[in-house]
Regions:
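Short, conserved beta-strand element in jelly-roll/cupin
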Residues: 36-38, 48-64
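A short, N-terminal "cap"/entry segment at the start of jelly-roll beta-barrel domains
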Residues: 1-33, 44, 110-113
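Short acidic-glycine-tyrosine-enriched beta hairpin
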Residues: 68-83
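Ligand-binding loop in jelly-roll beta-barrel domains
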Residues: 83-109
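Structural motif
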Residues: 61-63, 70, 86, 96
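Short strand-connecting beta-turns/loops that link adjacent beta-strands
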Residues: 28-29, 50, 94-95
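Histidine-centered metal-chelating micro-motifs
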Residues: 42-44, 63, 79, 83-89
């Protein structure tokens, strides 16, 4: 039987020295992670060979940088990232941002820089 998932019970990890992530769903064919980024934080520009991702902002503002443009996502907005598309999530605002990263299949081990 499935159990409710939350950041209180999920496996936690730190990335980029100042950002947090919680594995809400961790399966071979699906990953759902809640992440938190403080102001000024950003991930390394990268792409995934197989994983299709969907970033969905829960609170705050997230900038998704692509080669040719930047997309600013507000609370309750999301964006799909196709496999092979270079991208970089950034928090260029003055407030913390929390968001979901949904990957299918999971993106662990699939990241290219």
């Amino acid at each position: 039987m499935s159990e409710p998932a939350s950041t209180a019970t999920a496996d936690h990890y730190v990335w980029g020295e100042v950002c947090d992530g919680w594995h809400l769903v961790r399966a071979e064919n699906l990953s759902v992670i809640e992440e938190r980024m403080p102001p000024g934080a950003e991930e390394e520009r990268h792409w995934h060979e197989r994983a299709r991702q969907f970033f969905y902002v829960l609170e705050g503002e997230l900038t998704m940088q692509f080669d040719d443009r930047a997309v600013i996502l507000q609370s309750r907005q999301g964006i799909e990232i196709a496999p092979g598309l270079p991208h970089q999530a950034k928090n260029t605002s003055n407030a913390e941002v929390s968001f979901l990263v949904i990957s299918q299949p999971r993106s662990h081990g699939d990241r290219q820089t």
